[in-house]
């Protein structure tokens, strides 16, 4: 979380780029949510996307329900196979791997304003359980207030990054301690995980929009894109899987 211009979207882009450089669409898939319609939509057309970048609140709710259904399906597959997690399952089945799935929300505040209970429930359920089956969450917001980053949500998202924020209160909302209000902006961040006693100050990398576009254009020129429309449709809440 962080204020406008602090480096939040650049950080998301560097994470996405790093994952794209290291994983084919067979190994890793994305669901991306961008209510502002300007940050993540440039990734439309890459083969790693399960569905076009979602800009609609109701479609986001459907996608969260689909993803929790996918999580349950994966747990059933692992149980039937006797595997503890996705890593051990994929080692046993090198020719039939389950891809990891990263669900990215670039502006949580817009979703919480329209569908708070459904969005919060979906995020919490995935944050609590989904990592073992290879489903991961990246959630970002410019407004780190307690009605956006709720206590339950925060309790279930142990790895947090705070960019420059306006006040000590905002810093405490993200990290449970002050400090983010003193950051300098432009990728200056505090990073905290569950096994750290206090946040670590880190300088984020920078990637330009031109560099992102170059990678996206290259990926678009390769594999054919296959989208699953059921992910964002009502009723697509766990009845089918792409994998």
What annotation goes with each model-predicted range?
Residues 14-18, 25-32, 39, 62-243:
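P-loop NTPase motor-domain active sites and their immediate coupling elements
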Residues 42:
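Short loop/helix-cap segments at secondary-structure boundaries that form the rim of catalytic
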Residues 3-5, 141:
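The conserved Walker
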Residues 50-68:
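Conserved nucleotide-sensing/catalytic segment adjacent to the nucleotide-binding pocket
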Residues 8:
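Conserved lysine of the Walker
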């Amino acid at each position: 979380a962080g204020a406008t211009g602090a480096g939040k979207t650049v950080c998301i882009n560097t994470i996405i780029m790093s994952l794209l450089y290291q994983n084919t669409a067979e190994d890793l898939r994305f669901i991306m949510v961008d209510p502002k319609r300007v940050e993540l939509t440039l990734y439309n057309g890459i083969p790693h996307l399960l569905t076009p970048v979602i800009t609609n609140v109701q479609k986001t709710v459907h996608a969260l329900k689909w993803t929790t259904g996918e999580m349950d399906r994966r747990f059933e597959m692992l149980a039937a196979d006797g595997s503890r997690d996705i890593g051990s399952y994929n080692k046993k089945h090198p020719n039939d791997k389950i891809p990891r799935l990263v669900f990215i929300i670039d502006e949580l505040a817009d979703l919480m304003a329209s569908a708070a209970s459904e969005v919060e429930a979906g995020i919490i359920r995935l944050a609590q359980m989904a990592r073992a089956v290879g489903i991961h969450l990246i959630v970002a917001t410019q407004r780190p207030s307690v009605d956006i980053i709720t206590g339950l949500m925060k309790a279930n998202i142990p790895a947090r990054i705070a960019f420059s924020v306006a006040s000590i209160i905002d810093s405490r909302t993200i990290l449970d301690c002050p400090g983010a209000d003193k950051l300098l902006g432009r990728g200056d961040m505090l990073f905290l995980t569950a096994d750290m006693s206090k946040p670590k100050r880190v300088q984020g990398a920078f990637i330009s929009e031109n560099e992102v576009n170059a990678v996206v254009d290259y990926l678009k020129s390769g594999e054919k894109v296959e989208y699953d429309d059921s992910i964002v449709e009502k009723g697509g809440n766990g009845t089918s899987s792409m994998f």
